[in-house]
A protein has these predicted regions:
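Basic, amphipathic N-terminal segments that precede the first structured/catalytic domain
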Residues: 1-41, 171-173
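Short, flexible loop/turn motifs enriched in small residues
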Residues: 38, 46-49
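Residue-level detector of short, conserved catalytic/binding motifs and their immediate flanks
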Residues: 39-41, 52, 121
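Conserved catalytic cores of phosphodiester-cleaving nucleases, focusing on short active-site segments
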Residues: 43-45, 52-58
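Catalytic cores of nucleic-acid endonucleases
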Residues: 59-126, 148-154
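Short beta-alpha junction loops
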Residues: 127-131
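Polybasic (Lys/Arg-rich)
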Residues: 132-173
Length: 173
């Protein structure tokens, strides 16, 4: 197994087998501006028999302060919208690669050969400096915003977890 690690938002993710990970943000298609304004998660990884779309954030806005100013309200909505867009765009791009609608030369044979009709797809946001009480709030907001996409792709779960939980789950070193 050739190991792969990556640093995102001040956290070291991995070590993953290089055949288990697709660095969507580092792909040529993404880097070459294939689609302007495309927003993606950090990477897609085959982890513990699940396909995980993983986004990393260093912190969240404090949702309890959203009514304190127009700027705080805008930051709050931008945070939710940004993550939702990243998951939507990433799922669309990834599955266009898997189905061969776009060149999939950067995707490992292992990922290409998974039986996508049977695997669980999970959306994960790892937040380094999370307000613990805000994780459920943000998860619920993202569930509402992503419910259609989650139904289309039969995604059962979205998780917002802090760095400590990510370490216990084997995402972060």
């Amino acid at each position: 197994m050739e190991g792969y690690e990556t640093i995102e938002s001040g956290m070291t993710f991995g070590t993953y087998d290089k055949d288990d990970i697709f660095r969507i943000e580092k792909s040529e298609m993404y880097q070459n501006g294939f689609v302007n304004d495309l927003r993606t998660v950090e990477f897609v990884v085959w982890h513990k028999e699940k396909l995980v779309f993983l986004e990393a954030k260093s912190s969240t806005p404090n949702y309890q302060n959203i009514d304190k100013s127009k700027e705080k309200t805008e930051k709050y909505h931008e945070f939710i919208n940004s993550i939702a867009e990243k998951f939507e765009d990433s799922m669309d791009l990834y599955f266009s690669l898997i189905t061969g609608r776009q060149s999939n030369s950067e995707v490992s044979e292992k990922l290409l050969k998974l039986d996508y009709s049977k695997i669980n797809i999970v959306l994960v946001v790892v937040i380094k400096n999370a307000f613990k009480d805000s994780l459920l709030h943000y998860r619920d907001k993202l569930n509402m915003q992503l419910r259609t996409k989650m139904k289309i792709w039969n995604v059962k779960n979205i998780f917002l977890i802090d760095e400590e939980t990510a370490r216990k789950k084997g995402f972060v070193k």
